[in-house]
Amino acid sequence: MTNSPSKVFAIVAGEISGDILGAGLVNSLKKRYPDARFIGIGGPRMQALGFESLFPMEELSIMGLVEVLSHLPRLLHIRSSLVKQITELAPDCFIGIDAPDFNIGVELKLKAKGIKTVHYVSPSVWAWRPKRIFKIAKATNMVLSLLPFEKAFYDQHQVPCTFVGHTLADDIPMHSDKLAARQLLGLDPNAEYLAVLPGSRGGELKQLAEPFVKAAQLVKQTFPDIKFVTPVVNDARRQQFLAALEEFAPDLEVTIVEGQSREVMAAADCILLASGTATLEAMLVKRPMVVSYRVSPITYAIAIKMMKIKNYSLPNLLANDTIVPELMQANCQPQLIADAIIKQLNQDFAPLNTRFEELHQLLKCNASERAADAVVALLQTP
């Protein structure tokens, strides 16, 4: 335990994955500073640890360049108010978790005022808009990266960076028990299941629910006995998904589970999901998957000009190879998705499972403890 007067940590997490990382970090910092205060923007997991959230986290969970524009006045108001409140609070450190378009602007202002800043989860500067690294260097005292190849990129540009690994790799066992997950969820132990995960945000469901449920219908034509299960993060997403089912696949029976997305993945024989952190989770529970994603055409037209990578999903980026199928934008079509799922269900999973195990081991580093150690080290520097 670090002998120190009470510390104050300001933290901003912008979505569910950030809330998970934030909760792990808060927990580890509490071991070192039991009387510390944690304040900023966080979700239910962080708040359960005594974190004080000044705004609802979901206000920052907006997908796509075009979609952000309509929310821009509110986002700017939140950022301005947050910077003012944190400046007055004068915390020992500000930690922005992911949400780079929001957090790096906050970090820039706070660092200029003499507050130490950390950015937890490297923005994908190695993938697109690489010049952002210069702004990151100006905005942060240190970056905490989840992926091993990111640190090398920061080292090339002389930006302080610590690779900490990923909390999901620490939390998820090397073997995820399918039958135990099914028992927990009340699912048929003998059936074949496809987990359908069209995203946790409203904007994602708006784009992906239709092609995903239509693809599920097509899969059922080839596998008449297959069953479907979908996790939803809250009642609003449940209603949105039910509306899509009613409109696009009214005869499709889907078991809907609130929360427990990891258990749903573990219970499945194959997973259809949106790109993002969920793809890493699917890899760590060691299940075959198909990744599909689309955004508004304008957002895509802008983004594609800035992209520097051929793959989007985390398993493929970590492997530096296309080990899981990706169907993006124009390829996010029911028939193409269904064909990819059918192929996954029919092929031997053992070789891919071995790759998943190797990547899991690479990321298993006790991330929350390493991140907390890095923050403590930063606080101890002049």
UniProtKB/Swiss-Prot annotation:
This is Lipid-A-disaccharide synthase. Its EC number is 2.4.1.182. GO terms for cellular component: membrane. Disulfide bonds: none annotated. It comes from Shewanella frigidimarina (strain NCIMB 400). It catalyses: a lipid X + a UDP-2-N,3-O-bis[(3R)-3-hydroxyacyl]-alpha-D-glucosamine = a lipid A disaccharide + UDP + H(+). Condensation of UDP-2,3-diacylglucosamine and 2,3-diacylglucosamine-1-phosphate to form lipid A disaccharide, a precursor of lipid A, a phosphorylated glycolipid that anchors the lipopolysaccharide to the outer membrane of the cell. It holds the Pfam family LpxB. GO terms for molecular function: lipid-A-disaccharide synthase activity; phospholipid binding.
